[in-house]
Each structure stands twice: as structure tokens, then as C-alpha cells.
From Swiss-Prot:
Cross-referenced SUPFAM superfamilies: HSP20-like chaperones
Species this chain originates from: Mycobacterium intracellulare
Entry-linked InterPro entries: A-crystallin/Hsp20_dom, HSP20-like_chaperone, Small_HSP
Protein name: 18 kDa antigen 2
Function: Not known. This protein is one of the major immune reactive proteins in mycobacteria.
């Protein structure tokens, strides 16, 4: 059996996923890294009104929602390439993060979350008793 293949179909599908379409908006791009005793996550949200941002946390899942409203229908649009509608992204956080003290800041189209490392996840010393009852500290 022969299957006809278009070599550009996969490339076209990949491009649509990156740029998004009206029916399926592009994903909220993000970067995440550890900076000392905290994790930092940045989401690119250009053109999003700060009032439309919504952050929720339930257990260890952070949900970020934002909305870019539709274009005024009275406009005669010549091009409509920017994704519109509601955007949503969820992050599952590990138990080693302190979800009670998340700091969120939105500036210049970038939403930045700073999530501190939980105290229970930080290195600490544990005392070890010897047979003669002397204590020696080791790193854990």
C-alpha cells in the first residue's frame, strides 16, 4: 500500500501550532529557572491588559489565565494575525516549593512568578549520636 505524503504538511502544522489560529490560540510561551532559593517563571503575554490576568493555585497546581479581547467588529481588518480570546496555562509545582508565598509581577507584557523553595526542601544538618553518646553533625 502506498501513502501519498506532502513533505510540507508537517512543517505547516508546526507553524500553525507556534503562531496559533483564531480557533486555537497559541500557547502562552514561558521560561522557568532556579535562582538561588526560589524558582522563577516568566510568561510572555504581550498586549494583555493587567486587569484580565487571573492566577489561581489549588493544591500544587498554578493556573494562569489571560484574555485578549476580540477586535471591534466595526473595523475593516486587513490582517488578523494576533491570537485573541482566553489563554490558559497550568503548572504542576513540586512539594519542595512554598506555594503560600508566590509573588507575581506583570511588566512590559511579561508575567513573572517567584516561588520560594520550601523550608523542608532546604539542606540542613542532622545530629548523629555515637555509641558513646557524643553528637556529630552531618549535612543532609
Amino acid at each position: 500500500m502506498l501513502v501519498r505524503s506532502d513533505p510540507f504538511r508537517d512543517l505547516d502544522r508546526f507553524t500553525q501550532q507556534l503562531s496559533g489560529t483564531a480557533a486555537r490560540p497559541a500557547a502562552m510561551p514561558m521560561d522557568a529557572w532556579r535562582d538561588g532559593e526560589q524558582f522563577v517563571v516568566e510568561f510572555d503575554l504581550p498586549g494583555i491588559d493587567e486587569q484580565s490576568l487571573d492566577l489561581d493555585i489549588e493544591r500544587n497546581v498554578v493556573t494562569v489565565r489571560a484574555e485578549r479581547p476580540d477586535v471591534d467588529p466595526s473595523r475593516e481588518m486587513l490582517a488578523t494575525e494576533r491570537a485573541r480570546g482566553v489563554f490558559s496555562r497550568q503548572l504542576v509545582l513540586g512539594d519542595n516549593l512554598d506555594t503560600e508565598h508566590i509573588d507575581a509581577c506583570y511588566d512590559a507584557g511579561v508575567l513573572r512568578l517567584r516561588i520560594p523553595v520550601a523550608e523542608k526542601a532546604k539542606p540542613r544538618k542532622i545530629a548523629v549520636n555515637r555509641g558513646d553518646r557524643q553528637q556529630t553533625a552531618i549535612s543532609a
